Amino acid sequence: MEKMHITNQEHDAFVKSNPNGDLLQLTKWAETKKLTGWYARRIAVGRDGEIQGVAQLLFKKVPKLPYTLCYISRGFVVDYSNKEALNALLDSAKEIAKAEKAYAIKIDPDVEVDKGTDALQNLKALGFKHKGFKEGLSKDYIQPRMTMITPIDKNDDELLNSFERRNRSKVRLALKRGTTVERSDREGLKTFAELMKITGERDGFLTRDISYFENIYDALHEDGDAELFLVKLDPKENIAKVNQELNELHAEIAKWQQKMETSEKQAKKAQNMINDAQNKIAKNEDLKRDLEALEKEHPEGIYLSGALLMFAGSKSYYLYGASSNEFRDFLPNHHMQYTMMKYAREHGATTYDFGGTDNDPDKDSEHYGLWAFKKVWGTYLSEKIGEFDYVLNQPLYQLIEQVKPRLTKAKIKISRKLKRK
């Protein structure tokens, strides 16, 4: 096994084709990390010109100290049963990490627990310290240890039927409601950032500046690994649909009124049907007024939600999502999610990753809503083997490990105070 010098394109091709590859190991992802002070180095090992393993090493300075942390996010990308390749990757990583004055090498492989026996054993044998099997969104991890993934390698009907029943009904309703899902361009990031600000204010979290999303889009869109989707509501088109539904409801009432006059047996049923239709008419009249007001103010329509969809080979990722407070009954997010899944499938993806979660948290948990949303999309829990540290400077590592919990608690307190404002 030997060190190899490969191009960025060769690195990315290996990551995208390897079952343990991940978005965070793509070379263009490292470009997105520069804004937050990270810089990258890359390594590869192989035999007879054939690549056996790669890794993208991210480095960040420790504040006020001449040291760095080496972080291999969702790496190494290698067959973890191949001890020789794994050992060669570690040797290469140590060489670079020491040159960059790293106090530790941290990895969190994209390897699931039920397939991770070799990885766990071989990493520990090499001297890696396992950080344990904590909850998916534990503050002790950089990346979530658990994510929710929908298999999308199936036709439209099979995909829809894989969703939980109530969610399936909502998707079907969303498709009828009259929103349009657009695959947007860079200009659409302005709208997305505005929606993200609204979402943050509603849900109580700090949001990123537009430059953050532009950075991701600029780095990954050219290779087809980042797409922006926006959901639009056209008032004129939907007023026409509401008028059609109102006409149908009035016709329905006339039909049941006629039955009431001709059949005493059906009188009770007819009255119930009439009452139901009248309730629907009242709701549609309210909706029509709202749409007419919208048409006066925004005749071109408004955007209700948006998302960034990412790719790494056969894996797709719902990275960021945002939505308006208006016209939520149109279920724009349901229309968008189903559309993005189909788009991802059509562009070679077999899985759709909703991102981090805990495993079936209690209803009073701050993470319950996140889990409840993600579980209804035909997802399974992807539980990773977690983080591992290879210590290069034991005294500094111990010091930072002792200080880190206090910093985490301080960040949580600040975050909670901001939420209450």
UniProtKB/Swiss-Prot annotation:
UniProt entry keywords in alphabetical sequence: Acyltransferase, Antibiotic resistance, Cell shape, Cell wall biogenesis/degradation, Cytoplasm, Peptidoglycan synthesis, Transferase
GO (cellular component) term, any one: cytoplasm
Enzyme class label: transferase
Localization annotation: Cytoplasm
InterPro entries: Acyl_CoA_acyltransferase (IPR016181), FEMABX (IPR003447), PG_Glycine_Bridge_Synth (IPR050644)
Entry superkingdom: Bacteria
GO MF entry, a single one: aminoacyltransferase activity
Gene3D superfamilies: 1.20.58.90, 3.40.630.30
GO process terms (BP): cell wall organization; peptidoglycan biosynthetic process; regulation of cell shape; response to antibiotic
Pfam families for the chain: FemAB
The reaction(s) this protein catalyses: beta-D-GlcNAc-(1->4)-Mur2Ac(oyl-L-Ala-D-isoglutaminyl-L-Lys-D-Ala-D-Ala)-di-trans,octa-cis-undecaprenyl diphosphate + glycyl-tRNA(Gly) = beta-D-GlcNAc-(1->4)-Mur2Ac(oyl-L-Ala-D-isoglutaminyl-L-Lys-(N(6)-Gly)-D-Ala-D-Ala)-di-trans,octa-cis-undecaprenyl diphosphate + tRNA(Gly) + H(+)
Enzyme Commission identifier(s): 2.3.2.16
Family under the similarity heading: Belongs to the FemABX family.
Subunit comment: Monomer.
Function: Catalyzes the incorporation of the first glycine of the pentaglycine interpeptide bridge, which is characteristic of the S.aureus peptidoglycan. This glycine is added to the epsilon-amino group of the L-lysine of the membrane-bound lipid II intermediate (GlcNAc-(beta-1,4)-N-acetylmuramic acid(-L-Ala-D-iGln-L-Lys-D-Ala-D-Ala)-pyrophosphoryl-undecaprenol), using glycyl-tRNA(Gly) as donor, in a ribosome-independent mechanism. Involved in methicillin resistance.
Name of the featured protein: Lipid II:glycine glycyltransferase
Species of provenance: Staphylococcus aureus (strain MRSA252)
